[in-house]
């Protein structure tokens, strides 16, 4: 491996697409070291530090043929990935490429394929983060998609075939932003995890993720013993009212320099479930939370989103905190046709496979198949805590009574039916639902008093052995 001397800002071009300038903006000041001589390959790779973490990065050189990927450029990419694997360093890719170089023909396609193979070899071994700063078209679209986290700057465009090809083949009229811009990939396709405000923010978010994934820290028992605010005070008084779970997630996690440590991933995609990294008592954790503001039901997209995040955390030894308030799987013909059974099974598989410590907190209710899917003890949860008065059942009491006592309700006089239904529902809940019964059956631990939540969560996570799994992180 050829390592050249560190470069200074004055040596880099003033072109905003200049790869050296972009790499310098990613790395800690004065730590950028190119891994090869600058050439016309359309790629520049370098090593450097991110918050002190040794990191490998590569950047498309959009000043040369629009960053198109040729044989030589792909060799640089493969070498950079191999170096990161050998050093067990994270790797960050800055993408601004029009795809394979047409002039190099099939050889270029073969070279791009070798890049993909190297990325898959690195999967699950080292964190791979992609930052899309411009076009990532054709073959270059699949590069970011094979990595663990994809961040898009406002100018980012990801598509396999551009608007002209789409128009000529299908007759559809579409512009580049609608086809492959950040809104499309954070809200519709789920390809991107984060939409940044600008290029500087995109690089900042990449740095933050490298720090959290590679410098995970340890639980600070002193911080845990201080407890936290009464999270239940943030819940609505009525059990029927929706609420946004994200403020509760933020409150569970640390603030770092006055800023919440929570970095949400895919926040605008499959919004009934929230996923992201944060720090809890100084330790990096992954958080998965049902969001009642968006119905809170599991569906095909949210189950798949959560499953991928569970496997990402498991691959890199990140403990999980699962915040549960879910009425079950969303029913409907469209859900069945969209593959809720197949895609929902991915979440079951991911949790059952996971070896990292993982704690579940039931805040209000958990019914039906979601009872199992949301990190149940049956799937290997380290501990499951339930707040007082939370409901745990096959289904809600009122719905269950409508089935179990259908004949009695039908036979009741009209003016008495509603009162009978309410009485039967209360009896059913006392017998079959509620946290107390689950605790007696040792499926759950009893609810905590205000301020004790964090102590129990931290203790359960800190005491459990953390075994980092060795599996690939396939983009589910």
From Swiss-Prot:
Composition skew (Basic residues), residue ranges: 439-448
Ranges of residues in domain CoA carboxyltransferase N-terminal: 1-225
GO molecular function, one term: ATP binding
Domain CoA carboxyltransferase C-terminal: 226-476
Alphabetical UniProt keywords: ATP-binding, Ligase, Nucleotide-binding
Catalytic reactions of this protein: propanoyl-CoA + hydrogencarbonate + ATP = (S)-methylmalonyl-CoA + ADP + phosphate + H(+)
Superkingdom to which the source organism belongs: Bacteria
Listed transmembrane segments: none
Pathways involved: Metabolic intermediate metabolism; propanoyl-CoA degradation; succinyl-CoA from propanoyl-CoA: step 1/3
UniProt enzyme class: ligase
Any one GO cellular component localisation term in the record: acetyl-CoA carboxylase complex
Residue ranges the record marks as coiled coil: none
Region (Disordered): 439-476
Similarity remark: Belongs to the AccD/PCCB family.
Protein name: Propionyl-CoA carboxylase beta chain
Naturally occurring in which organism (per UniProt): Rhodococcus erythropolis (Arthrobacter picolinophilus)
Lineage start: Bacteria, Bacillati, Actinomycetota, Actinomycetes, Mycobacteriales
Gene behind the chain: pccB
């Amino acid at each position: 491996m050829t390592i050249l001397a560190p470069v200074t800002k004055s040596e880099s071009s003033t072109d905003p697409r200049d790869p050296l300038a972009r790499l310098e903006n990613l790395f800690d000041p004065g730590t950028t070291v190119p891994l090869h001589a600058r050439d016309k390959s359309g790629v520049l790779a370098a090593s450097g530090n991110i918050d002190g973490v040794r990191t490998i990065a590569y950047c498309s050189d959009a000043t040369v043929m629009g960053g198109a990927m040729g044989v030589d450029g792909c060799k640089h990419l493969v070498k950079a990935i191999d170096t990161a694997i050998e050093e067990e360093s994270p790797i960050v890719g800055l993408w601004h490429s029009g795809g394979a170089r047409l002039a190099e023909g099939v050889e270029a396609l073969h070279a791009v394929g070798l890049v993909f193979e190297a990325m898959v070899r690195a999967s699950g071994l080292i964190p791979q983060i992609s930052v899309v700063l411009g076009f990532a078209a054709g073959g270059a679209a699949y590069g970011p998609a094979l990595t663990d986290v994809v961040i898009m700057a406002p100018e980012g465009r990801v598509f396999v075939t551009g608007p002209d090809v789409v128009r000529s083949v299908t007759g559809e009229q579409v512009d580049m932003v609608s086809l492959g811009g950040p809104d499309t990939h954070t809200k519709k396709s789920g390809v991107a995890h984060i939409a940044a405000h600008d290029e500087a923010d995109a690089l900042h978010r990449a740095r933050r993720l490298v720090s959290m994934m590679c410098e995970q820290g340890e639980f600070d028992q002193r911080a845990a013993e201080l407890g936290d605010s009464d999270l239940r005070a943030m819940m609505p008084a009525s059990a029927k009212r929706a609420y946004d779970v994200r403020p509760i997630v933020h409150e569970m996690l640390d603030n770092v320099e006055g800023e919440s440590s929570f970095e949400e991933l895919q926040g605008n995609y499959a919004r009934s479930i929230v996923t992201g990294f944060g720090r809890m008592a100084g330790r990096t954790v992954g958080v998965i939370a049902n969001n009642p503001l968006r119905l809170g039901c599991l569906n095909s997209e949210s189950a798949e989103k959560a499953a991928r995040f569970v496997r990402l955390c498991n691959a890199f030894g990140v403990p999980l905190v699962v915040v549960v308030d879910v009425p079950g799987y969303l029913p409907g013909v469209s859900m069945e046709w969209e593959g809720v059974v197949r895609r929902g099974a991915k979440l079951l598989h991911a949790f059952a496979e996971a070896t990292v410590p993982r704690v579940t907190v039931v805040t209000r209710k958990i019914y039906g198949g979601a009872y199992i899917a949301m990190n149940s003890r049956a799937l290997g949860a380290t501990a499951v805590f339930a707040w007082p008065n939370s409901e745990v059942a096959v289904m809600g009491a009122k719905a269950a009574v409508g089935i179990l006592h259908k004949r009695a309700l039908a036979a009741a006089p009209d003016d008495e039916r509603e009162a009978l239904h309410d009485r039967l529902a209360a009896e059913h809940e006392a017998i079959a639902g509620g946290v107390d019964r689950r605790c007696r059956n040792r499926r759950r631990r009893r609810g905590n008093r205000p301020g004790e939540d964090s102590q129990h969560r931290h203790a359960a996570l800190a005491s459990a052995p953390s075994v980092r799994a060795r599996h690939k992180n396939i983009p589910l």
